[in-house]
């Protein structure tokens, strides 16, 4: 019985860690793409680009905070 409980808890922990790593990689990839988009469009609509990127960043931070509260 103890082996089964340990295996179940360990499997759940591994699942949470892999989900957390996957989400962090998505957030990092989206932040890198947003930074590249901001550099390319800096001359034309910098205020709108900044606002859009800032809004995306805030949403990503909220998602990360929510997921951390669930996973930790």
Curated annotation (Swiss-Prot):
Q: Indicate the family of this protein.
A: Belongs to the glucagon family.
- Give the protein's biological function: PHM-27 is a bioactive form from proteolysis of the same precursor protein, that causes vasodilation. It is a potent agonist of the calcitonin receptor CALCR, with similar efficacy as calcitonin.
The record's misc note reads: X's at positions 28 to 44 were included by homology with the human precursor sequence.
Quote the Gene3D superfamilies the UniProt record gives: 6.10.250.590
Q: Which GO terms describe its cellular component?
A: extracellular region; neuron projection
**What keywords does the record list, in alphabetical order?**
Amidation, Cleavage on pair of basic residues, Hormone, Secreted
Q: Where in the cell is it found?
A: Secreted
Q: Which PANTHER family match?
A: GLUCAGON-FAMILY NEUROPEPTIDE, VIP PEPTIDES
Q: Which GO terms describe its biological process?
A: adenylate cyclase-activating G protein-coupled receptor signaling pathway; epinephrine secretion; mRNA stabilization; positive regulation of protein catabolic process; prolactin secretion; regulation of protein localization
Q: Its Gene Ontology molecular function terms?
A: neuropeptide hormone activity; peptide hormone receptor binding; type 1 vasoactive intestinal polypeptide receptor binding
Give all Isoleucine amide modified positions.
27
The Asparagine amide modification is found at: 72
Identify this protein by name. VIP peptides
List the InterPro entries.
Answer: Glucagon_GIP_secretin_VIP, VIP/GHRH-like
Matching Pfam families, A to Z? Answer: Hormone_2
Q: What's the superkingdom here?
A: Eukaryota
